[in-house]
């Protein structure tokens, strides 16, 4: 069994947490997030001017409910930790466009991509995500919700996945594409 759920989470100084019914609300300098909780108890603990969150699975109810609470214990801990980091520091993901004539522009709240198709592709950016195109072949996606930032990055990457022969396409910064060898005569 994994012990991720039993580790305590340190709360940063600039973050406030509200626990109500079956939800946790996290507020910080960059914004606020909420998460519905099922079959999990949360306790706040003070140790030497630092606040910690401790998660416990609910041990009452049917065997099925107990099992479900133990299964989700580590997941909830990680989600809450991601929320705390998101509202205090934020998350960002960088994408690069590799190919001749591949360009990206930000027009209003749309990302306009020229990626080798006969038409330009318009990608609608969600309201809580920030996109920066300071260079025409680099896209920086940032926000406070880790899941949304990575989801937007994955959706943009899927528009033109890197192909295995020349490596052209949209890829994450630092991603290594293993190239295949072409036909030999």
Curated annotation (Swiss-Prot):
Q: Which gene encodes it?
A: RPL6
| GO BP annotations, alphabetical order | translation
List, alphabetically, the NCBIfam families matched: L6_bact
Residue stretches spanning the membrane:
none
* Protein name per UniProt: Large ribosomal subunit protein uL6m
User: What keywords would UniProt list here?
Assistant: Mitochondrion, Ribonucleoprotein, Ribosomal protein
Q: Name one GO molecular function term.
A: structural constituent of ribosome
Pfam families, per this entry? Ribosomal_L6 (PF00347)
Native organism = Reclinomonas americana
The compartments listed are: Mitochondrion
Family statement = Belongs to the universal ribosomal protein uL6 family.
What's the superkingdom here? Eukaryota
């Amino acid at each position: 069994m994994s012990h991720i759920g039993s580790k305590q989470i340190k709360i940063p100084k600039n973050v406030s947490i509200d626990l109500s019914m079956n939800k946790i609300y996290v507020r910080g300098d960059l914004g606020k997030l909420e998460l519905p909780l099922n079959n999990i108890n949360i306790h706040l603990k003070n140790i030497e001017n630092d606040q910690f969150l401790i998660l416990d699975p609910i041990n009452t109810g049917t065997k099925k409910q107990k099992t479900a609470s133990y299964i989700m214990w580590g997941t909830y801990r990680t989600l809450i930790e991601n929320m705390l980091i998101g509202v205090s520091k934020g998350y960002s993901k960088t994408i690069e466009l590799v190919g001749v004539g591949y360009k990206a522009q930000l027009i209003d709240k749309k990302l306009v991509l020229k990626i080798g198709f006969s038409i330009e592709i318009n990608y609608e950016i969600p309201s809580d995500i920030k996109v920066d195109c300071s260079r025409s072949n680099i896209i920086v996606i940032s926000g406070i919700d880790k899941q949304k930032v990575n989801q937007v990055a994955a959706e943009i990457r899927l528009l033109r996945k890197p192909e295995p022969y020349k490596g052209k396409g949209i890829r994450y910064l630092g991603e290594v594409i293993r190239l295949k060898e072409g036909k030999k005569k």
